[in-house]
Swiss-Prot record:
Substrate binds at residues 8-15, 21-22, 58, 60, 82-85, 104-105, 151-152. This is Probable phosphoglycerate mutase GpmB. It comes from Escherichia fergusonii (strain ATCC 35469 / DSM 13698 / CCUG 18766 / IAM 14443 / JCM 21226 / LMG 7866 / NBRC 102419 / NCTC 12128 / CDC 0568-73). The keyword Coiled coil does not apply. One of its GO terms (cellular component) is cytoplasm. Belongs to the phosphoglycerate mutase family. GpmB subfamily. It comes from the Bacteria. The record marks H150 as: Transition state stabilizer.
Amino acid sequence: MLQVYLVRHGETQWNAERRIQGQSDSPLTAKGEQQAMQVATRAKELGITHIISSDLGRTRRTAEIIAQACGCDILLDPRLRELNMGVLETRNIDSLTEEEENWRRQLVNGTKDGRIPQGESMLELSERMHSALASCLELPQGSRPLLVSHGIALGCLVSTILGLPAWAERRLRLRNCSISRVDYQESQWLASGWVVETAGDVSHLDAPALDELQR
């Protein structure tokens, strides 16, 4: 059975400022760096063998800290990027107009084709996240990979493994540097394929960020 660990990046400047990041970027805060060091300590205990990260700066920095603790190289995979939030990227969430807020909500309230102008849909996000996860099945036997990605992206992945549609209303909170785990199993008695073992574990963190943006 393959175990794959999923880690969201540490808190960023724009998380703290309540700005929409998407595939735009901002650096980790001092708190985010500390969170990354704490999740790195846990990752070392887990015996991680491979680290695969989104190629955005905030995930790369988080992955670098984890890799240093685990003694692993980092493979960058753009399929693990955050949802493309189109024209709303860099905007403060409290400054959105009613029309813009409706665009944002359509992504996650059951609207299959909802998307922000110049952005991508949750279905498109789900397809590339599942493709990245499936690549882990090609790793050598005995591997224990860790993927570093983003709040909406990981929430979409975990939710769809549980059988929810990609565009379902978001009811899964994955805080900065939380750890989730999904397992791939083949069984005559249990569900075959990917199953969720853990979601959003923050027991390794001193003070989880109260981040409502989840990205």
